[in-house]
């Protein structure tokens, strides 16, 4: 169990607001960008250049594919979902993925290692520790500001010769043909481009055998094609901020289950924690309105003093919590990944890591199809991807939703069962290893390694 992460940044354009539905004109298309009457034909079009879409584009390009990325929000704008104040709890497998994409060195400067996780229930006697020693690694994961990840990805996207990066840009008029999918990309009024010739063009047509939607859970193009991920609200939101404490964290994260939802503290720097506090909506309104001193007092009362005395909170933000998945992640020549395909509760830090594995899996399937000279967007290729991700998506969704329902049950008998379970887990190393392997995505990475080994 990774510890709760902030809700996945590629799913929301800002606090309690949807992400941009369709991206808005090329930031750095190649100097020989086509005229509006001459479609440019990359191998894959990626709608959404945030964390998951950016990772997908780099993974595709690393294997030789030509990629066009269309992102709505200006890269440096506060509205950019990949550049907000949330934190990510990355698994060690995510670190390896980013290292393979050539961006981990930039991210690592901002990363704090999670060495162990303390899990407990407020007011209960059961508790357990999960340690990197349980799985023999250097760390269970890493806490990273989403802004650092987004900036590293965007720098690499602009540098990569195989990537045509349209940002800020809008994608409209998507048409799914028998042999290709086409979309019109319009440059925003304040967009910048790589050349004066490109700057003079307001619209360009992209055509490719495959289009990937990575533009979040409220994707307009997703609703028109494969359908949006059906989401069920938890009637909760996550309040996120960073607090100081009078104790060094020493790499320890906390997952504390309370009567209204999990409360997580993630090691942020030497004496700071990133806070992810699941709150019922009525309580969230009141907590957001508190003064800093009163908020710290409320947080201390909810969590206790195991992590020390809290002080000096940063600005708070809130994000709605929900779960669900698209009935079908793929349609004719279109596939959705990340929050465009599924939404999970941030408990156990699964959301972004799940979307990142979507990106790597799709890139691996496309790479295999290219080696075999197959149509990248044919039904068989998309079915292969959907089957590759079906089991893990369902497993992670059931796991995170199950945790919330089990720990949200206030019946005395269930409380006793929970505390016995936590206490029993503490003395069962095989169960710890199993839990950690599942939450770190080890099974999915094994499947992807097998696919890569078929090259």
Show where each model-derived region lies.
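Conserved FAD-binding catalytic core of PHBH/FMO-like flavoproteins
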Residues: 98, 188-189, 198-205, 210-316, ...
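FAD/FMN-dependent oxidoreductases across multiple families
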Residues: 285-372, 376-377
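N-terminal Rossmann-like FAD-binding beta1-loop-alpha1 element of flavoenzymes
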Residues: 43-69
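N-terminal FAD cofactor-binding segment of flavoenzymes
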Residues: 82-122
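Extreme N-terminal leader/targeting segments of oxidoreductases
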Residues: 1-44, 59-63
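Conserved N-terminal helical subregion
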Residues: 40, 110-224, 232-237, 292, ...
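C-terminal helical "tail/cap" subdomain of flavin- and related membrane-associated enzymes
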Residues: 364-455
């Amino acid at each position: 169990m990774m510890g709760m992460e902030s809700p996945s940044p590629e799913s929301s354009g800002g606090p309690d607001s949807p992400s941009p539905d369709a991206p808005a004109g090329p930031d750095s298309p190649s100097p020989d960008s086509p005229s509006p009457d001459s479609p440019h034909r990359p191998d894959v079009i990626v709608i959404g250049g945030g964390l998951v879409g950016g990772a997908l584009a780099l993974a595709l390009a690393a294997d030789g594919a030509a990629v066009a990325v269309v992102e709505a929000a200006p890269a440096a704008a506060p509205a950019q979902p990949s550049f907000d104040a949330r934190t990510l709890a990355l698994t060690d497998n995510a670190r390896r993925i980013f290292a393979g994409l050539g961006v981990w060195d930039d991210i690592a400067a901002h990363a704090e290692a999670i060495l162990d996780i303390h899990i407990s229930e407020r007011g209960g006697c059961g508790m357990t520790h999960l340690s990197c020693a349980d799985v023999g690694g250097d760390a269970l994961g890493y806490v990273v500001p989403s802004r650092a990840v987004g900036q590293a990805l965007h720098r690499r996207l602009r540098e990569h010769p195989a990537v045509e990066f349209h940002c800020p840009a809008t994608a409209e008029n998507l048409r799914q043909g028998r042999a290709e999918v086409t979309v019109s990309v319009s440059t925003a009024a304040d967009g910048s481009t790589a050349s004066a010739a490109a700057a003079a063009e307001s619209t360009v047509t992209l055509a490719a055998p495959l289009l990937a939607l990575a533009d979040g859970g409220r994707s307009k193009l997703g609703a028109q094609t494969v359908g949006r991920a059906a989401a069920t609200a938890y009637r909760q939101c996550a309040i996120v901020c960073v607090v100081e404490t009078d104790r060094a964290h020493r790499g320890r994260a906390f997952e504390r289950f309370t009567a209204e939802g999990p409360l997580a503290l993630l090691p942020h720097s030497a004496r700071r924690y990133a806070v992810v506090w699941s709150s019922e909506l009525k309580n969230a309104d009141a907590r957001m309105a508190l003064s800093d001193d009163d908020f710290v007092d409320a947080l201390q009362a909810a969590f206790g003093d195991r992590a020390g005395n809290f002080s000096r909170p940063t600005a708070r933000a809130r994000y709605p919590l929900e779960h669900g998945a698209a009935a079908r992640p793929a349609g004719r020549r279109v596939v959705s990944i990340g929050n465009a395909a599924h939404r999970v509760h941030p408990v156990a830090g699964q959301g972004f890591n799940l979307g990142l594995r979507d990106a790597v899996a799709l890139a691996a399937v496309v790479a295999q199809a290219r080696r075999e000279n197959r149509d990248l967007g044919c039904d068989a290729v998309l079915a292969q991807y959907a089957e590759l991700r079906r089991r893990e998506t369902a497993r992670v969704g059931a796991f995170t939703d199950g945790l919330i329902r089990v720990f949200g049950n206030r019946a005395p008998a269930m409380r006793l069962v929970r505390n016995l379970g936590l206490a029993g887990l503490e003395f069962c190393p095989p169960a710890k290893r199993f839990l950690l392997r599942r939450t770190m995505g080890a099974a999915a990475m094994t499947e992807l390694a097998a696919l890569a080994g078929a090259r």
